[in-house]
Amino acid sequence: MATFSQKPTEVVKKWVIIDAENLVLGRLAAFVANRLRGKHKATFTPHVDDGDNVIVINADKIALTGKKYTDKKYYWHTGYIGGIKERTARQLLEGRFPERVVEKAVERMIPRGPLGRRQLKNLRVYAGSQHPHEAQQPESLDVGALNRKNKRIA
């Protein structure tokens, strides 16, 4: 029997919604990254985008363990000499776009390259509980119930 290799025309993508309230950031990001890549499917093929469309709501209510809320730093470079910048997770979560913490965590768990960029476009993260994807009828997934370590009650 030959090894199964899925073709891009055979891919069936589902819509999944995840409520991130009180979920641990790294555990949520790992789960979402696997869903985006399609590794949860028996038809997983490394060079084909067969992952699901994932919607994450309440990204501003994510939980960080230990002292990461105040100590974790996000770095970027402006492109100018000496232009390294940093912000803490607290500054990002209390700032204008708190959903970027979840986006960055998932982005860094997906392989870099053209396929990874295409898979990352299937991720939609919203700070609040409202989202414009009701027409897709997303299936709700309770990540907190999968493992007791996935959820933190603050």
Curated annotation (Swiss-Prot):
GO MF entry, a single one: mRNA binding
GO biological process: negative regulation of translation; translation
InterPro entries: Ribosomal_uL13, Ribosomal_uL13_bac-type, Ribosomal_uL13_sf
A cellular component annotation (GO) from this entry: cytosolic large ribosomal subunit
Source superkingdom: Bacteria
Function: This protein is one of the early assembly proteins of the 50S ribosomal subunit, although it is not seen to bind rRNA by itself. It is important during the early stages of 50S assembly.
Entry similarity comment: Belongs to the universal ribosomal protein uL13 family.
The protein's name: Large ribosomal subunit protein uL13
Source species taxonomy: Bacteria, Pseudomonadati, Pseudomonadota, Alphaproteobacteria, Hyphomicrobiales
Gene name of this polypeptide: rplM
